[in-house]
A protein has these predicted regions:
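Bacterial N-terminal signal peptides that target proteins for export
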Residues: 1-7
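Compositionally biased, intrinsically disordered low-complexity regions
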Residues: 7, 74-75
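N-terminal Sec signal peptide cleavage junction
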Residues: 16-19
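Aromatic-rich carbohydrate-binding modules that target alpha-glucans
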Residues: 24-73, 81-110
């Protein structure tokens, strides 16, 4: 896998020893979104999906999806479903903005 010079890694624990959410560039035009934790389903929603839920694929305990993301500023969030409960999970060390509904979105900047 080739990583461009501007490749980045945003991954941090959401809770001390809890699940992790992350983002990393897969190549110059695609980004891999990941979630490592217990869940029934995980979805990416954001500007790059036109806010339509895109399912992450499970491999063991890790969920991921690779999405084409052009240059620019993109807001997104991961929605983690556990039974009746839905949690919004963002990488801990990422820029965040108000989502206009009392929550937050993460910000991804593609150079």
């Amino acid at each position: 896998m080739r990583f461009p010079t501007a490749a980045f890694l945003l991954a941090a624990a959401v809770a001390c020893a809890g699940p992790r959410a992350g983002v990393r560039s897969a190549n110059d035009a695609a980004v891999r979104f990941t979630y490592d934790g217990d869940a029934d389903e995980v979805y990416l929603t954001g500007d790059m999906t036109r806010w339509r839920p895109r399912p992450l694929v499970r491999a063991g305990r890790t969920w991921s999806t690779k999405v084409p993301v052009p240059r620019g500023r993109w807001e997104y969030r991961l929605e983690v479903h556990r039974g009746e409960r839905v949690d919004v999970v963002l990488p801990a060390d990422t820029e965040r903005v108000d989502d206009g509904f009392g929550g937050e979105n993460a910000v991804l900047r593609m150079p």
